[in-house]
């Protein structure tokens, strides 16, 4: 969800996000970290400016079971907010690991993680479409990708990269896609509570975009192996208005998944069950980050591990590699 980060405004039940000030906070933090090395945020040492992410043609060697391409937003990216300790190194994408890396290790797959914090279902298709902080933030300022490195570098859209990657790597055996959370957050940011007809219109667009994304992966990219649509969880399951929005989002994702033979990884039920003994609060359960003033919606290492286990269970009946 921006799937990106947190703002100074506390959302219902402690839900926090940071569409407009995330990048500023991240760059200030990065500058503070670099101050001890005599460098500014804009003058990273030469040894660290070399591209870390491979191009499509130079992707990692396949693991024993093949390749795994992860697509999505900040959750798949493994984003951690700047307030956590130890502070993340935003100039080093290897400092961020999410459920894709856990899944890859468990299944013996080499992972290429193309996720971008703040990606929406529209910006995944077209970089000029509104994002929630990947290319641009909600205030139309520069986003994450123009300013900080992703796990893998690519010039166009995330979907465009996926098509090229899958065409060049037919030994790819797993693709996961977690997208749509930032569609909901943009709706919350730009409208009054994102409900009723406005919510329905937002989710209809999400469904249409995911339809196009999955059709492109199956058609143009020619990918016919295991495909997983990763659902979303609630932060606090006692916050019924937000719970209902997440349920509606997951329902919007389920239709395209079924149409294109994708398995759905049910994060909503998994996080609800795991937080049941903690007041139905994922933050109290240690699944999302507890920050001063509220709960950040991004998963902790424990939360990412839970997500990985849900993905692994979801694909167990359909994997054949």
Features from the language model and the residues they span:
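Secretory targeting and sorting signals
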Residues: 2-51
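Serine-esterase "nucleophile elbow" of acetyl-processing enzymes
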Residues: 48-134
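Short amphipathic alpha-helices and their capping/turn segments at secondary-structure boundaries
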Residues: 55-67, 102-105, 154-175, 213-220, ...
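Structural recognition of the beta-strand scaffold that forms the well-ordered cores
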Residues: 67-72, 76-78, 110-115, 173-178, ...
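Oxyanion-hole/transition-state-stabilizing segment in secreted/luminal serine hydrolases
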Residues: 77-81, 129, 133-201
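Surface-exposed intrinsically disordered loops and tails
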Residues: 84-94, 126-154, 277-294
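Active-site segments of SGNH/GDSL-like serine hydrolases
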Residues: 181-182, 191, 213-248, 269
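Catalytic His-Asp segment of secreted/periplasmic serine-dependent ester chemistry enzymes
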Residues: 232-321
